[in-house]
Structure formats: structure tokens, C-alpha cells
Amino acid sequence: NDFDFDQVFEKQVQALGRPGDVLVGISTSGNSRNVIRAVDAANALGLHTIGLLGGTGGALQGKVGLPLTVSCTPHTPRIQEGHLLMVHLICERIEEIMETPA
């Protein structure tokens, strides 16, 4: 309880992240300090990073390995709906890959 809210995700990444893991950061502005710090920690540990972002992508646009940005609207609810669609598509693709025999 002695840590700032800006560190809430960063501390988890530092404790649990391993090279080869994937961190997905979600921020409608791309400027959420707690997500930025988590991405910075992930990058320092060699994790792959994906950003579900909005607008211009903010500060996270240049920090994540794969920025996925909903830039067609400035409205937070629409950005979040775009993020939800992205998550569903990503999960669907992962399921397809896992079901395919090697």
C-alpha cells in the first residue's frame, strides 16, 4: 500500500513478466501513466508489447511494439467498443491457431 497508483501495473509486470511474454496495454488516450509505466517495465524485461489505443495513440504509440489505434473517433465509448472488437478478433485468431494441428 506504499506505492502510487501510477505503479500499480508496473509492479505486477516486474514481479511476473518474463522474456517472451506479451503485455497488452489499454488506454483510450494513450497517455495513462500507469499503463505507460507498465509498458516501460515490460520493454526493460524484454516482453512483447501491444497497445490498444485511441486518438493519435498518445505517448504509448511510440513505446509499444504493436500499436492498435482506434483513431476514427474522439469519443471514449466508441474507442472502447473498438478495443473490445479487437480483443474478440485476437482471441478468435488465437483459438484458431491453437486448434490447428502442428
Where are the regions a protein language model picked out?
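Glycine-rich phosphate-binding loops that contact phosphosugars or nucleotide phosphates
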Residues: 1-100
